[in-house]
């Protein structure tokens, strides 16, 4: 989301695969230990230059060498990391408890613990088949009813919004709210 806002020329695209076929990535050890980790890469790799031992074969130079580093692109990747880290650093704390209700109802009810010093909150929801938060509603309250939204058809989450507009990470409901 932040990259789309601040660096739209990067045209980010999420690939929902843990890793590339037959190769590893720097993010994998983080994933293996339970941490979130993503791999940022050029989508159109040059296989004579990347992931090759340095050699010459049939008059073709193979190998990862300094002369093939695209420093303008590397600078942009560094900016992508900085944008996302800054956004997280400037964001408020996330709500600790998020309750969800709406079992056998035509509406979804959400309430959450107050986060001190925030401007408001954003309620997110998405289809169960979607990897991104496609819908949202802003509120300054700590409880909200999404009318006409059926609990079984979506995933839900809540983030805190700081005075500066930065949002915390989205928290999935972790408690049931019974009437």
What is each stretch, according to the model?
Residues 134-141:
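Short beta-strand segments within Ig-like beta-sandwich modules, predominantly Fibronectin type-III
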Residues 106-118:
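Conserved aromatic anchor
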Residues 166-177:
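Edge beta-strands of extracellular beta-sandwich domains
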Residues 1-94:
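Active-site-adjacent substrate-binding region
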Residues 121-123:
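Short beta-strand elements bearing conserved aromatic residues within extracellular beta-rich modules
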Residues 100, 112, 144-148:
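Hydrophobic core positions of the immunoglobulin-like beta-sandwich fold
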Residues 146-168:
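Beta-strand-rich modules
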């Amino acid at each position: 989301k932040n990259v789309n806002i601040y660096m739209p020329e990067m045209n980010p695209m999420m690939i929902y695969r843990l890793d590339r076929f037959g190769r590893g990535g720097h993010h994998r050890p983080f994933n293996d230990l339970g941490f979130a980790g993503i791999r940022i890469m050029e989508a159109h790799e040059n296989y004579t230059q990347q992931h090759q031992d340095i050699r010459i074969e049939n008059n073709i130079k193979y190998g990862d060498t300094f002369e093939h580093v695209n420093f303008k692109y590397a600078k942009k990747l560094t900016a992508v990391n900085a944008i996302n880290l800054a956004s997280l650093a400037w964001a408020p704390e996330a709500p600790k408890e998020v309750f969800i209700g709406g079992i056998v109802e035509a509406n979804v009810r959400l309430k959450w613990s107050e986060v001190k010093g925030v401007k408001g909150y954003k309620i997110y929801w998405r289809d169960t088949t979607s990897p991104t938060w496609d819908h949202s509603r802003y509120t300054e309250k700590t409880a909200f009813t999404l009318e006409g939204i059926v609990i079984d058809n979506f995933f839900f989450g809540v983030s805190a919004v700081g005075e500066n507009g930065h949002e915390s990470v989205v928290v999935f409901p972790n408690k049931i709210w019974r009437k």
